């Protein structure tokens, strides 16, 4: 039996034909942040300087990318661009490794050196590159950085260096190791010529680079959460057979332990470095306040405004008690009032950063000055953090480090002293409290730059003297300066603390008393 089928019909389009391109949505590449595990648009990450906009994780960037982020556009002149590593030891696989890494990264070796401007300040620069064998230091890296320092010394330029490295390049044997000493010698010559060296530690900075030029800067900055270590975490864990605590050897760990001056987010590094370069050129920066370490002064007020919180004392003991008042003006308030700006620097480079001693570079009417101040704090929480103004050995060593810097760069030093005395405790003795004070006395007595010390509150014994060996010693009219507190004097000599008032009068600890004795050079009226 035959089946009927429907005839197929064909639709025919009549009229002229036109072509049109189909529109597809733009392609986006997404990256997962290893820290917060969130997905980020690659373009957004790039616009944010390769920093996760959600958690602040700083991704690694190439040396040239970092150069573009930091240097004023159109000002960079590269030095020694044609130097390239060779396999001079015939190390197995090294020649092929150099070729493949060079093709992939577009670089001849792991550092880019040159000259450029940061916020208008002329400087020599080097940028290490983790994309080339993890920034390992071989003979070419050493030679290029060494030449950069030598040129900077000849030209009278500061040096700003960005470090990233897995350490020495093993494929070049002891030649790689020798670069540590070679660069360090060049850094020393540059420093002796009065040159400023700023290092910026980025993730990771380890091994021989950490144990040489990375930690030799006059000022050391670090990106957040950057691993900085001599021995890496894996090496230590294998050695110790235990897990390391979270944050160990990271930037914040370095800051807490006194080995860097500040942790600065990537987006603020250029402006922060520009501020520091301007200050070392001998003029005040006019760039604003890029980072919390820069504080703008309050203008138009007089010192007396800070000291009219309580009635004028009548006796020596009342003066002493008033210096201890929580309402009394702090060093931070005086710095904010008296200076146009202030950049705080941290750390003694040995053990820690003592919050009781605030130190850094300030400027007034365009002129830079090194400021070292003992800070008691105001609130209970802050006073505890600052140990009630009783400095540890690391506080005095931080002060000495900043004094030496001031001498090197020809800045005057201003010390603001307000302490009941140096901290007495087991840890302070273990870390050499007496030695720290003694070294300060010797250092200040021969410092070849002007020093002015002002006793702004209580000047307690050796802890105060450690910042009071100066060309000019001043006291605020409501301050006190003594070998011992009146209460301790009465207790020790007379076994009677009720005689503290008598002891205060006998100790001659007021500003007029000490001026009459020739101990101080002048009195500053703090009552306006």
What spans do the regions from the language model cover?
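Terminal-region recognition feature
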Residues: 1-198, 204, 216, 223, ...
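Active-site pocket-lining/capping segments in soluble small-molecule metabolic enzymes
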Residues: 224-226, 233
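Glycine-rich anion-binding loops of enzyme active sites
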Residues: 206-213, 229, 463
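Catalytic-face loop-and-helix region of soluble metabolic enzyme cores
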Residues: 239-240
